[in-house]
UniProtKB/Swiss-Prot annotation:
SUPFAM superfamilies registered for this protein in UniProt: Class I glutamine amidotransferase-like
PROSITE patterns in alphabetical order: GATASE_TYPE_1
Subcellular location: Cytoplasm
A single GO molecular function term of this UniProt record: glutaminase activity
HAMAP family: HisH (MF_00278)
Pfam family, one: GATase
Summary of the function given for this chain in its UniProt record: IGPS catalyzes the conversion of PRFAR and glutamine to IGP, AICAR and glutamate. The HisH subunit catalyzes the hydrolysis of glutamine to glutamate and ammonia as part of the synthesis of IGP and AICAR. The resulting ammonia molecule is channeled to the active site of HisF.
Assembly behavior: Heterodimer of HisH and HisF.
Protein name per the record: Imidazole glycerol phosphate synthase subunit HisH
Gene: hisH
A GO-annotated cellular component: cytoplasm
Coiled-coil segments on the chain, per record: none
Amino acid sequence: MIGVIDYGMGNLFSVSKALERAGARYIVSADVEELKKADAYILPGVGSFRDAMQLLKQTGLEGFIYQVVQEGKLLFGICLGMQLLFEESEEAGRTKGLGLLKGRVVLLKDHDKDGQKLKVPHMGWNELTFHQPSPLFDGVPEGFAYFVHSYYVRDMNPEEQLASADYGVQVPAIVGKGNVLGAQFHPEKSSTTGMALLKQFIQLANEQRVNK
């Protein structure tokens, strides 16, 4: 079963509907005891990095996330949820993140290296390029994904950048180290590629449960 962590800032409806379409058993909850019933977790997120970290601390969910990661359970961050996995963000002043992955979250530039203007936020479809082999990619086509974000991850470990998209800079699109995974785009809104990625995450969670 997949536990969707509800800390008050997630795109819960669209994530839930995507999990239903993927045939997954899931719960959406802010209650730690309820979430403990799950085998793997999704950390969604839309909004401010600082507000999200404050809510995770206030609800006790920050400690719960550290606990399940230490137990080896899969954690998959989506959009802001992915950014929260990193060390810090410059959004609204410097804010510490969960620190599960090395890297910092910074504002996208409004121009590319040739001076061509770019719209911020980065909103719409963009092509994915896979860099590192990962079990998360089994059966996942290297296609287009749907992005909505103004900040991106920089200074991360190159081997933990599993896929990227080009938006004036190389934007880490899928990241991962061990049981900690994330996508900057919205898999639940990303058609064939997004659904394939979610289904593979569910498959990995099922395999992990069976092999306990």
